[in-house]
Amino acid sequence: MKEKIVIALGGNAIQTTEATAEAQQTAIRCAMQNLKPLFDSPARIVISHGNGPQIGSLLIQQAKSNSDTTPAMPLDTCGAMSQGMIGYWLETEINRILTEMNSDRTVGTIVTRVEVDKDDPRFDNPTKPIGPFYTKEEVEELQKEQPDSVFKEDAGRGYRKVVASPLPQSILEHQLIRTLADGKNIVIACGGGGIPVIKKENTYEGVEAVIDKDFASEKLATLIEADTLMILTNVENVFINFNEPNQQQIDDIDVATLKKYAAQGKFVEGSMLPKIEAAIRFVESGENKKVIITNLEQAYEALIGNKGTHIHM
């Protein structure tokens, strides 16, 4: 059976100084060119992606247009909107590449829900800032309308709403994603970490939270029984003691050593550490699992073993 890969795109894949749709589509076009050799390979491919800047813009738009006739949409709905928007952009550019290659592969996006535990202790300590900045006076008014919401000062720039970042428990659409990926389809899923939902009797209900995209990508890779999780970020390799005089590049490492480095605080919290934690979970999820961490430009070279950081048992 051909290798199955989950590619977790970092925010730099859609990074641009302009927030227009055209500018973001151009950034994605350039990003996808780096993945062209993978699309031309026999590998079965699922792509996940971030949505930070995009959902931030959506939330600001919702706040500014909020009225009785155009009420602001909640965070889970905005997450779904961003998945559709970015998925559409990715589909367009990947389809362009597949057509140029005369490939018979197809590409599609699955709006993805991710189940979280309503009793996750992270709900008691919201830390993820979202949406626009507010003044102290604006926050006082908002608290009257949203008594359960939490606002925190953000580096002297004003106040922002903060939400929880619970751990993913399951991917509701994972069987569909697996079926599509096992065919000739390139599947885009788990955008922005997925839409967080909790079980309510015989259905699921969206909650106001943001799931770490690396943790969601790991959970997806585990559930669809992928062979490789490739996490694409803005550096070619993982380093211990990054940006310090004694920084050291890691090319190949086993999980036991990686755990030791993580326990010693060798990785930056909120930056490389979540990627390391996701990597450890995936490698330990089954036999012969591997994780590659590198940048977008070196994705194919890393896949064939020439670049990047390779993590294994």
UniProtKB/Swiss-Prot annotation:
Keywords: Arginine metabolism, ATP-binding, Cytoplasm, Kinase, Nucleotide-binding, Transferase. It holds the Pfam family AA_kinase. GO terms for molecular function: ATP binding; carbamate kinase activity. One of its GO terms (biological process) is arginine deiminase pathway. Signal peptide: none annotated. It comes from the Bacteria. It is found in: Cytoplasm. Belongs to the carbamate kinase family. This is Carbamate kinase 2. It comes from Staphylococcus aureus (strain NCTC 8325 / PS 47).
